[in-house]
């Protein structure tokens, strides 16, 4: 939850140069404090041009030395009321891939013991048997299953409150959460054997009809603007880096 528009407003930016300067400071902090794999969990900006600028600055500053995984937040959908979730996702994915970064939308990222890495997309995950996926991930050291998650299971704060502006309605939101949750449930027996991160914009209770944390997984999310960190060795919830406000 970087919320760059708020950061720019708070910095008193009056020109493009001011904006670039403000974003570069944020990017420098991210690069300096990151190593290996960095998760950027949505609500970067509701303005696509600003998102684009941020990604370009990040790619230039990181020099390809780090791996960046993104998921979309509800704010990333605001600017595209005439596009479907799939088309919006493709738009962001194309931008990120141009700069060597990854977008997860019901997809699985893996990194194996030889430091090879890649994405298994939703369409492929849906068709694979668990035996096939187990073989595919045989050498993986880390897997990240990620997506927006949406808020289909949150009856109090959801699309009816305008959290996607006019782009995603309640029916679509519920369908998208079911899509993610159903795949999550299918993958559980395979991911149980791996070092697994469940990476979503919204917390598990918003997208899952049975929001019970798996003892071996780390759950990373944002959206709430209330930082939470909990790790008792059995339940691991890392939602403590929401820094945009």
Residue map of PLM features:
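N-terminal active-site segment of His-dependent metallophosphoesterases
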Residues: 1-70, 76-82, 192-193
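Active-site-proximal loop/helix segment associated with metal-binding centers of metalloenzymes
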Residues: 6, 120-197
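Metal-dependent catalytic neighborhoods of phosphoester/phosphodiester hydrolases
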Residues: 9-10, 42-60, 75-99, 108-124, ...
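Short amphipathic alpha-helices and their capping/turn segments at secondary-structure boundaries
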Residues: 25-31, 55-62, 93-94, 98-141, ...
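Structural motif
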Residues: 37-41, 69, 144, 197-199, ...
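Conserved beta-sheet core of the metallophosphoesterase superfamily
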Residues: 69-70, 141, 203-245
């Amino acid at each position: 939850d970087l919320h760059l528009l708020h950061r720019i407003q708070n910095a008193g930016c009056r020109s493009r140069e001011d904006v670039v300067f403000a974003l570069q400071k944020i990017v420098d902090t991210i690069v300096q404090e990151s190593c290996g794999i960095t998760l950027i969990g949505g609500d970067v900006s509701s303005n696509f041009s600003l998102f684009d600028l941020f990604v370009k600055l990040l790619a230039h500053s990181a020099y390809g030395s780090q791996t960046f995984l993104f998921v979309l937040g509800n704010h990333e959908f605001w600017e595209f009321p005439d596009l479907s979730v799939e088309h919006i996702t493709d738009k962001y994915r194309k931008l990120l891939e141009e700069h060597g970064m990854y977008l997860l939308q019901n997809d699985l990222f893996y990194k194996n013991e030889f430091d090879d890495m890649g994405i298994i997309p939703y369409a492929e995950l849906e068709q694979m048997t668990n035996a096939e996926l187990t073989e595919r991930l045989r050498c993986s050291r880390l897997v990240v299953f990620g997506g927006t998650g949406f808020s289909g299971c949150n009856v109090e704060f959801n699309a009816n409150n305008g959290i996607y502006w006019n782009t995603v309605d309640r029916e679509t939101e519920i369908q998208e959460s079911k899509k993610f949750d159903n795949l999550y449930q299918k993958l559980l027996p395979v991911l149980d054997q791996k070092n697994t991160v469940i990476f979503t914009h919204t917390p598990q209770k918003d997208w899952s009809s049975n929001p019970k944390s798996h003892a071996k997984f780390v759950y990373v999310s944002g959206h709430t603007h209330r930082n939470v960190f909990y790790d008792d060795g059995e339940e691991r919830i890392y939602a403590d880096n929401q820094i945009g406000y």
